[in-house]
């Protein structure tokens, strides 16, 4: 069996990290067994679907490296849905309804008032339909036995179908709702595993009966706990979680992937530089039932770790600044975003403004400039400079911080020994002199 998964977004808005996490889970499950990951664009809602959102979804997945083996669009599959709908109708599993939303709301309130579940009440067979009213269509659930399955995350699941309303599958205007087309597609595309959020658990119960009604074996099901942020449930309106915002913040795709792959599991977050390594450790058995908390600070930390551990070859295509492998290795331990390299290159090769210097440090820095000018820079100039300056009686922070500030304009950064050698004699002496004046 070839493991085949799918990610099925609706192009009614941009993706957020909750969507991305679902796409990633499906990609990793397929990748770890050499299977296929598909993209299905759920654009049955022709009024709300937008082509620009389709383009953005594809671009976001491409940026993340989650490239599908194939892409299908539901709007191009209506004939197939019609055929399967007709079969279900002929079998008596689909029936017409004519209630208005207002009538359904009254029915619901009456049931709640009687302390009964607000389940749709089927009309008696043969009940007359009002003239001139276009019907919508419901799938008739089979009440004869419970709906059960072994969920790959939640364990054994059991639903009583009599406590679930027969779902509307088609609107009065003929347009399709989510449930039935999704099942038809999963059958046609030979989907073996459906991984999605726990908010789809009841949908899955209903859809299992649809698979059976269409004479098809269902896929394996896995429902993960939802991703939540400090503000609460994630949504497409939570702008800080959009791919564009994350990219603008300098977040690398594998930092985001590494974090999202482990959120909600018992496994620690381990930053990986490629999806193949990430797939090797992906295990649905480690997922818990509690909501997974998304914290942008954790994304930043994952980004920092990624850059600190990635080799130049692994990150070179993402670097906009012109930088050598040697310089990247020198600087990478002190950046949280690749965009910070540009400022560090100024430290190495640019003209920095003279550092602000305390009066008590001016003579010390003038002496440092004089010593630095006389050193043999083919050796270890930092060690020799520090040793010579200890004769001033300075030590520790009083010795090293004024030098670092004068030479780099910063209070922290890479080790000074390799950094000073890379800055070079002429530039270093000039900066020390400038800071002493």
What residue ranges belong to the model's regions?
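Residue-level signal for inorganic ion chemistry
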Residues: 16, 26, 57, 88, ...
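C-terminal accessory/binding modules appended to enzymatic or scaffolding proteins
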Residues: 312, 358-407, 411
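Short amphipathic alpha-helical segments and their helix-coil junctions
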Residues: 1-6, 243, 276-282, 317, ...
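Short, histidine-centered active-site or binding-site loop motifs used for metal coordination
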Residues: 7-11, 41-43, 184, 188, ...
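Active-site cores that bind ATP or allylic diphosphates and position pyrophosphate for catalysis
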Residues: 96, 100-223, 228-234, 242, ...
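Catalytic adenosine-cofactor/nucleotide-binding cores of aminoacyl-tRNA synthetases and other
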Residues: 214-353, 408-437
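N-terminal Rossmann-like or analogous alpha/beta NTP/dinucleotide-binding catalytic cores
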Residues: 1-116, 203-216
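Residue-level detector of short coil/turn "hinge" positions at structural boundaries
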Residues: 68-69, 95-96, 218, 253, ...
């Amino acid at each position: 069996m070839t493991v085949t998964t799918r990610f099925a977004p609706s192009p009614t808005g941009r993706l957020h990290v909750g969507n991305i996490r679902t796409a990633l889970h499906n990609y990793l499950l397929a990748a770890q067994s050499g299977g296929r990951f598909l993209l299905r664009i759920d654009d049955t809602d022709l009024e709300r679907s937008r082509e620009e959102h389709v383009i953005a979804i594809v671009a976001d997945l491409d940026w993340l490296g989650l490239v599908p083996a194939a892409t299908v669009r539901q709007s191009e599959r209506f004939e197939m849905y019609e055929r399967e709908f007709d079969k279900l109708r002929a079998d008596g599993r689909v029936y017409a309804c004519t209630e208005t939303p207002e009538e359904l709301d009254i029915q619901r309130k009456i049931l709640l008032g009687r302390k009964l579940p607000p389940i749709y009440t089927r009309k008696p067979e043969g009940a007359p339909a009002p003239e001139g009213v276009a019907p919508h269509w419901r799938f008739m659930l089979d009440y004869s036995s419970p709906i059960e399955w072994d969920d790959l995350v939640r364990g054994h699941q059991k639903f009583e179908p009599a406590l679930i309303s027969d779902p509307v599958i088609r609107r009065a205007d003929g347009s399709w709702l989510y449930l039935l087309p999704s099942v038809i597609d999963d059958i046609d595309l030979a989907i073996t595993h459906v991984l999605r959020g726990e908010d789809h658990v009841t949908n899955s119960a209903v859809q299992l009966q649809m698979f059976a009604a269409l004479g098809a074996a269902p896929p394996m099901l896995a429902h993960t706990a939802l991703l939540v942020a400090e503000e609460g449930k994630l949504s497409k309106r939570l702008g800080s979680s959009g791919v564009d915002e994350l990219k603008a913040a300098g977040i690398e795709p594998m930092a985001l992937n590494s974090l999202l792959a482990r959120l909600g599991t018992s496994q620690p977050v381990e930053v990986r530089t490629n999806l193949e390594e990430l797939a090797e450790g992906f295990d649905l058995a480690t997922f818990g039932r509690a909501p997974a908390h998304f914290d942008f600070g954790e994304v930043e930390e994952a980004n920092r770790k990624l850059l600190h551990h990635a080799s130049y070859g692994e990150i070179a295509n993402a670097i906009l600044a012109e930088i050598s492998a040697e310089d990247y290795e020198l600087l990478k331990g002190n950046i949280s975003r690749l965009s910070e390299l540009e400022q560090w290159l100024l430290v190495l090769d640019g003209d920095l403004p003279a550092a602000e210097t305390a009066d008590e440090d001016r003579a010390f820095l003038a002496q440092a400039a004089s010593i630095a000018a006389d050193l043999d820079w083919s050796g270890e100039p930092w060690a020799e400079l520090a040793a010579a300056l200890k004769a001033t009686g300075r030590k520790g922070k009083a010795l090293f911080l004024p030098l670092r500030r004068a030479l780099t304009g910063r209070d922290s950064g890479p080790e000074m020994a390799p950094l000073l050698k890379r800055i070079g004699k002429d530039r270093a002496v000039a900066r020390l002199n400038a800071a002493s004046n």
